[in-house]
């Protein structure tokens, strides 16, 4: 007799790997004529901006640029000045060979080292390296057995649930607006911003993201070395074309400013501000699929091979804010803090004190003017440990897809001590992988030995916790017959307490 096997496909968890790579940096930056010449270098920062990611069998290609920003003290009392350069890069990474049907790549990292020196007052040499931490997460279409029939087959079904990665989109968008200064700025030291998506609407194949970008501008007036701050809110409303997106998806969208351009207005006209945002959208579609977890035949011997299927589910989503504080002594008790910045290392997960935390190493850099009127750079390292707020086992396989940003940063000098107060915003999702054992293949063998017709019932002493299906399989009888013969409630799957069971029509 032929056994009928029915199959379907589900998006199983695929390869999950993390690798490190180094982006070398070697450049010369020329100070423009409209900027003061260099008196003293204060600090150099490097930030990667990844514009393209291409995943191929055994290869991952990253394209983007390194944003190199140099802060210096200008000559003749010019105060704090800034210049920057964008250095394009293409990085090809070797990966293990694996099959995938959906994927996402998370690129993080931190500066490994930077050496910055003044060649002459209008030429700066920068050498160093940025360490990338690249995480690749995939799903792969996997066939599973969903039902069996004929051949006297009995089956135990299990429902597998998880999420299918429906969409991964990273898109650069432009946001424009105006900023009005009380007096024309002699120099704009820094443009930075925080963006948040306040409303996200899903349509079939489209997403509408509405939010606000808060831009902060540090600038200096003509003849005044004191830094001033100006901020402006720019609203954005972006319609994104997203293949595979539908209204039943679980979705998140994170906005990150990656560049700014300021065009000075003529006369009394306000200056024109153009910001470039990277919108990162992730979407998952929930699914459920019944699979055959175990099977046997009441008429034939069976030979089966187990199959382990890993599914992915959304353990939780993150939209949390946490405040970090820290302090440390300054070499000059009379230092005056002028500006401060925060950079984040890779976001990791750690199990501590019966709870999972999202962790990251945060470096806060503060610029200060010492008692000799020279500018110095001070650093304070903070440790982020954000509780996920959900009970998960200590051995859970979790994958973070998270982004961290500084919502608010304040640094002050009090009695010779640098005091830091940082508000961190964490956005993203935590995926959880779970292993499930199913029947991968099954075939009928030789017919079973006919039951002894003189034996109509057998007695089996079952122990607490034994599964009814396993007992029925041992004697090659239908679980439904076991239920009926022992007056067990319909739906009973396991024995609660030790008891004697009648086994009807048992074979030899």
List each language-model region with its residue ranges.
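Primarily a LysM-type cell-wall glycan-binding module
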Residues: 446-484, 489-508
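Membrane-lipid interaction segments
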Residues: 2-454
């Amino acid at each position: 007799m032929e056994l009928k096997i029915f199959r379907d496909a589900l998006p199983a968890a695929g390869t999950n790997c993390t690798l490190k790579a180094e982006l070398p940096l070697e450049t010369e930056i020329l100070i423009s004529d409209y900027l003061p010449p260099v008196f003293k270098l204060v600090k150099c920062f490097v930030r990667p901006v990844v514009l393209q990611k291409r995943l191929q069998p055994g290869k991952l290609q990253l394209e983007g640029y390194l944003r190199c920003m140099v802060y210096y003290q200008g000559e003749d009392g010019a105060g704090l000045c800034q210049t920057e350069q964008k250095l394009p890069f293409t990085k090809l990474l070797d990966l293990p060979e694996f099959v995938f049907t959906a994927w996402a790549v998370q690129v993080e990292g931190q500066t490994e080292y930077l050496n910055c020196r003044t060649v002459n007052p209008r030429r700066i040499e920068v050498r160093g390296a940025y360490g990338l931490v690249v995480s690749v997460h995939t799903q792969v279409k996997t066939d599973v057995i969903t039902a069996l029939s004929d051949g006297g087959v009995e089956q135990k079904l299990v429902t597998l649930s998880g999420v299918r990665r429906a969409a991964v989109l990273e898109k650069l968008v432009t946001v424009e607006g105006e900023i009005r200064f009380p007096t024309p700025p002699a120099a704009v030291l820094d443009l930075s911003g925080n963006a948040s998506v306040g409303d996200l609407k899903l349509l079939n194949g489209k997403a509408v993201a509405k939010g606000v970008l808060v831009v902060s501008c540090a600038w200096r007036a003509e003849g005044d070395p004191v830094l001033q701050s100006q901020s402006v809110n720019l609203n954005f409303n972006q319609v994104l074309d997203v293949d595979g997106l539908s209204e039943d998806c679980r979705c998140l969208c994170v906005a990150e400013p990656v560049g700014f351009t300021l065009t000075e207005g003529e006369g009394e006209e306000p200056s024109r501000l153009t910001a470039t945002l990277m919108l990162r959208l992730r979407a998952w579609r929930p699914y459920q699929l019944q699979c055959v977890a175990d099977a046997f035949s009441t008429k034939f011997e069976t030979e089966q091979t187990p199959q382990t299927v890993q599914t992915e589910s959304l353990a939780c989503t993150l939209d949390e804010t946490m405040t970090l504080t820290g302090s440390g002594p300054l070499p000059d008790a009379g230092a005056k803090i002028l500006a401060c910045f925060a950079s984040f290392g890779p976001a990791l997960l750690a199990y501590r004190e019966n709870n999972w935390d999202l962790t990251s190493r945060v470096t806060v850099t503060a610029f200060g003017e010492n008692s000799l009127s020279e500018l110095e750079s001070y650093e304070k390292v903070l440790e982020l440990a954000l509780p996920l707020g959900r009970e998960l086992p200590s051995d859970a396989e979790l994958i973070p897809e998270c982004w961290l940003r500084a919502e608010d940063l304040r640094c002050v000098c009090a009695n010779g001590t640098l005091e830091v107060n940082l508000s961190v915003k964490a956005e993203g999702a935590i995926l959880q992988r779970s292993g499930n054992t199913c029947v991968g293949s099954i075939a009928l063998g030789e017919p079973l030995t006919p039951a002894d017709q003189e034996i109509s019932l057998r007695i089996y002493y079952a122990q607490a916790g034994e599964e009814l299906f396993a007992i029925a399989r041992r004697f090659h009888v239908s679980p439904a017959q076991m239920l009926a013969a022992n007056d067990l409630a319909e739906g009973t799957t396991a024995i609660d307490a030790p008891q004697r069971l009648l086994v009807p029509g048992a074979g030899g």
